[in-house]
């Protein structure tokens, strides 16, 4: 079977999902020095072979982000090495310093995942989207029809209405920022000094 690389730490459920699909997994460790995110150099020097890689930007569980130059390098590395990039962008919109860059800017072969559960605050409605290269669209559509048919109509209507209330959603992000700043100031006083930068999402690591 195919082999997918996960850059650690990562969203824990990925392992279970991939194992359920009988996909082999290799792990590539990131560190604070790489901002708990992969780099093209890290992938090149990993010594591991894989057909695809999943990245999360901003990251769950670290809140760390991949800057634009590094993301471009990763996209180029994947294209040059025939590795499918799968970019989980669920936390786009929840950033505190610079906006998160989408892999679509740098790659025509990447798969991009997103959801209405995070920035749009529709957790529980289980609605999201996938952006795929055109040559994969029909196969993914066939797969989707056999897994969940289609999302509920009411969830789609609610999601569309959320675009009319971006000011409210941005207000949520400002509240997340306030909470992050409080924690970033207080946690070191409690002994949690060596933390991730928490540039996005709502996690410290």
Give residue spans per PLM region.
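Active-site PLP attachment segment
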Residues: 105-139, 151-154
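Hydrophobic residues in well-ordered beta-strands that form the structural core
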Residues: 6, 27, 55, 87, ...
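Conserved PLP-anchoring active-site segment centered on the Schiff-base-forming lysine
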Residues: 1-18
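Active-site phosphate-binding strand-loop segment of PLP-dependent enzymes
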Residues: 30-98
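A short helix->loop->beta-strand "cap" motif at the edges of active sites that frequently abuts
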Residues: 2, 23, 80-84, 108
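Amphipathic alpha-helix from the class-I
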Residues: 134-139, 153-174, 186-189
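Conserved glycine-rich beta-strand-loop-beta hairpin in the small C-terminal domain of fold type I
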Residues: 160, 176-187, 194-205
């Amino acid at each position: 079977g195919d082999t997918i690389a996960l850059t650690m730490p990562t969203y824990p459920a990925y392992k279970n999902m991939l194992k359920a699909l009988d996909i082999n997994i290799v792990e590539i460790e990131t560190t604070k020095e790489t901002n708990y995110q992969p780099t093209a150099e890290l992938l090149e020097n990993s010594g591991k072979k894989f057909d695809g890689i999943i990245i999360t930007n901003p990251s769950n569980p670290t809140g760390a982000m991949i800057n634009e130059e590094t993301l471009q390098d990763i996209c180029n590395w994947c294209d040059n090495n025939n590795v499918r990039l799968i970019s989980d962008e669920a936390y786009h919109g929840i950033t505190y310093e610079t906006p998160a860059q989408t892999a679509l800017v740098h790659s025509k072969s990447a798969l991009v995942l997103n959801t209405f559960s995070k920035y749009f605050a529709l957790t529980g409605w289980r609605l999201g989207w996938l952006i795929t290269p055109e040559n994969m669209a029909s196969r993914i559509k066939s797969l989707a029809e056999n897994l969940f048919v289609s999302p509920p109509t009411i969830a789609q209507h609610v999601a569309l209405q959320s675009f009319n209330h971006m000011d409210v959603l941005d207000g949520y992000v400002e509240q997340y920022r306030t909470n992050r700043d409080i924690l970033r100031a207080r946690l070191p006083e409690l002994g949690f000094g060596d933390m991730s930068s928490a540039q996005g999402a709502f996690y410290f690591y």
